[in-house]
Every structure is written in C-alpha cells, then in structure tokens.
C-alpha cells in the first residue's frame, strides 16, 4: 500500500457547506499559567477557513514530555502527519477520516496468477494505516472477483493469518499464502 496523501478530515465548516478539511501543517499552543492547550489547525478544502481540533486541553505543562511539547511548538511535520491519521483523536473529537484517494496498491501480480502451479507467500505492507477490508485487498492484489476470493479461501487456496476474517479491516502489515493451482 503506497501513500498518495493524507486522509481528509470530515467535519462541517462553519462558513460554507463543505465538510472536508486538510491539515494546515501547524499547531496552536496556548499556555495559561501551568496549564496548556494544544490544537491541530485545519483548513476547509473549499473556503480555506481555519478551524482547530483539540489535541490536549488544560493539561499540566509538566505532564507533556519536553520533546512532544517542542514538536507542537515547532509544528513538527511528522507529528502533524501522525495526528492527522489518528483514529483515536478523530473518535475523541467527533470527526471521521476520509481515506479516498490516499493510497494505491502496488503489486507484482502481472508476474503471478492464481492459476499458476507454484505457491506464493505475499507480504502486504502499509505506508499509511488505511483501514481496508481483507477481501478488497485480495480482489485488487490478485485481480480476481469477490466470489473467486471467497471460493479460494473456502478451498484453502488462500491461507490467511489465523485471526483474520475476509470482512475484517486491516491497517497493519501481514502475510498470506496463495497455493498454486497444482497444489489443490
């Protein structure tokens, strides 16, 4: 899974009818005595209005590691990236992530077909934690239909990691094996 961009943040804009925002690349850090507020700044994709998502509210300055505090103060791009993709921050602050157009599947399938006699072990690696169904990954990667994927799993031609279900969403690296046509 190759990264093509960060997910859009879906929340209503107060100025226009659009719901898609993108990170501005900046944080706002406000200290009031010993208490600190940190917000991730977003821009509306249509009108450009800036809005903020609370990252930390009224936390004691000493409760944040100095390196983390410095990352907020210097608008560290990797911290902006990590918080933009944070499903827990999205859930906590009431928005959702739109992963449309943020990834593409790179595969060597022109060099392998499920009809070939050899078995193959496939490593699926994620540059982005895109939540995608296992079934869809297999369809795209092997260039076969949903029904064919289900048949291959039922016949154990596709062997998935034990706790994995075709309908489950994955976002971390995993391996699976496709048994060749000659090994059935």
Model regions: which residues?
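Ferredoxin-like alpha/beta domains used as RNA- or RNAP-binding modules
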Residues: 1-134
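Long, intrinsically disordered, low-complexity Ser/Thr/Pro-rich regulatory/activation regions
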Residues: 174-184
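Conserved "cap/hinge" positions at secondary-structure junctions
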Residues: 55, 162, 178-180
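A basic, amphipathic helix-loop patch mediating RNA/tRNA/ribosome contacts
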Residues: 125-176
